[in-house]
């Protein structure tokens, strides 16, 4: 099992090109199920999760290839509208095939999902939405089984804001009969990116980027070309690493507008941040100031950046209060950061971080995707050697992280 071996060795300096967003690429790949025509997707990150999704699509009969970050999808010969447990158990986003399959083929069997163990993250909102659109759904033997002659447009109000739920219902609505209105829709840039691809494929969607999406169903969608939006969480992770190490880095290929909440907090921590149309520069001239925040849905502070800012706060001056409102069980990295010398206490959905001048290297274990990233940041600023075990979590969401960090001066090795 692979591990990271990190020697803390001072500031990160240089340039990093940001990859396409995993959380946009996965639903966009599923959108290929909505048409028999060819869909070409650029800027697809080379990750465990994207490879798993392509494998899942192939299992259903789709022709799916990826070369140099470009995925070519051809869904004319799909013969098995089923997502089996062996793949779904490793990746929650597999649920995203449910809406497209039932919309185009009238049937779908999808195993209940797996992925990072950071809370319940129920799929009931997906199911309620599809039922409102006329699907008959049963859950038995660990599978969600959905059937519909043709989905019917409906007004769907989700009980909570759900990113994958919005994406699933949006894809389903494109081929439904009549008008579908999705109220309380997620506004994340990744949802917007999916919607923009669907429009290129012939979908009729109004309200893109808002919490109310209005979809006029069409009889068929056609092929299209699209480029996946940049990964704002990868960008935020590298910015936190630079801030923690008192570095000076430039990120390329990232529009700063999708990272507003993170950049505000980095400036509050004392960083100098400059931006252009598709680049961000961060310089941290002195030890960071502790910053408190509360996670919430976009455009507020993202839950996927909580762990990385906790690592930054661990070596900041002062005390920060972090409140996690999106997922339960998302403080599993606290114990591991404390092994490195951090001073963090967590109770319920709140953590209090009192910054210390130095961390010290130790062996630690990754517990989920973003927790892994926080341990990497901590390892970069710790005295001595840090070894991070179970980095397969990290490989699910970061494209060659060790190579990108090495290029800006980090001493980080992948070892077996």
From Swiss-Prot:
The UniProt record gives the binding positions of phosphoenolpyruvate as 22-23
Keywords annotated in UniProt: Cell cycle, Cell division, Cell shape, Cell wall biogenesis/degradation, Cytoplasm, Peptidoglycan synthesis, Pyruvate, Transferase
Which InterPro entries has this protein been placed in? Enolpyruvate_Tfrase_dom, Enolpyruvate_Tfrase_sf, MurA_subfamily, RNA3'P_cycl/enolpyr_Trfase_a/b, UDP_GlcNAc_COvinyl_MurA
Name the major location: cytoplasm
Q: What positions does the entry give for UDP-N-acetyl-alpha-D-glucosamine binding?
A: 92, 121-125, 304, 326
Can you state which reaction this protein catalyses? phosphoenolpyruvate + UDP-N-acetyl-alpha-D-glucosamine = UDP-N-acetyl-3-O-(1-carboxyvinyl)-alpha-D-glucosamine + phosphate
Q: Which family does it belong to?
A: Belongs to the EPSP synthase family. MurA subfamily.
PANTHER family in the record, alphabetically? UDP-N-ACETYLGLUCOSAMINE 1-CARBOXYVINYLTRANSFERASE (PTHR43783:SF1)
Protein function: Cell wall formation. Adds enolpyruvyl to UDP-N-acetylglucosamine.
- Can you name this protein? UDP-N-acetylglucosamine 1-carboxyvinyltransferase
Question: Which organism was this protein described from?
Answer: Cupriavidus metallidurans (strain ATCC 43123 / DSM 2839 / NBRC 102507 / CH34)
